[in-house]
């Protein structure tokens, strides 16, 4: 899916007790723990078996932007942006721990990511979704202005 640039770029106002922070060179163990906690229920597998070197080459790349959502000091979600193909930027991952789903925080995270992407002066924004994602994901992306531009079938082996 890709988004037209009609979305709001107003800064997101976070509820009390929440902060959405850029984490440069996130520790690999912290990333793996957050990725697994957020993504296991949704069968996120493509990063699970990477070596430290492979993972670091992705998430520590200067064109990769990781933002973590915290409730107090506890990470409860994250967004990962990939700007390696700039002026195209991909929202690679967006997700929350299960207890935080349904509170509107996913929408706030995507809106904050879109504001950051707009500041980069991107010309195209990509986000991928699939039938394994939370049922609210696709309707959220559509409400925010994303439209489907391609469809493909992929087999995921989750061991």
Each language-model region and where it sits:
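Conserved glycine-rich acetyl-CoA-binding loop
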Residues: 97-111, 120, 132-136
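Conserved beta-strand-loop-alpha-helix junction that forms the acyl-donor binding cleft
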Residues: 101, 127-137, 154-159
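Acyl-donor-binding surface of acyltransferase catalytic domains
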Residues: 1-24
């Amino acid at each position: 899916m890709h988004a037209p640039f009609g979305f709001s770029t107003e800064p997101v106002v976070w509820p009390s007790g929440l902060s959405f922070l850029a984490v440069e060179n996130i520790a690999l163990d912290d990333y793996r723990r957050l990725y697994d906690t957020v993504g296991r229920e949704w069968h996120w597998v493509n990063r699970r078996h990477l070596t430290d070197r492979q993972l670091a080459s992705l998430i520590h790349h200067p064109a990769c932007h990781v933002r973590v959502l915290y409730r107090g000091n506890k990470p409860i979600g994250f967004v990962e942006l990939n700007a390696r193909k700039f002026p195209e930027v991909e929202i690679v991952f967006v997700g929350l721990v299960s207890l935080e789903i349904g509170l509107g925080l996913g929408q706030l995270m995507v809106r904050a990511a879109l504001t950051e992407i707009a500041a980069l002066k991107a010309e195209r924004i990509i986000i991928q979704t699939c039938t394994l994602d939370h049922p609210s994901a696709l309707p959220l992306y559509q409400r925010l202005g994303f439209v489907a531009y391609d469809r493909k079938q992929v087999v995921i082996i989750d061991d």
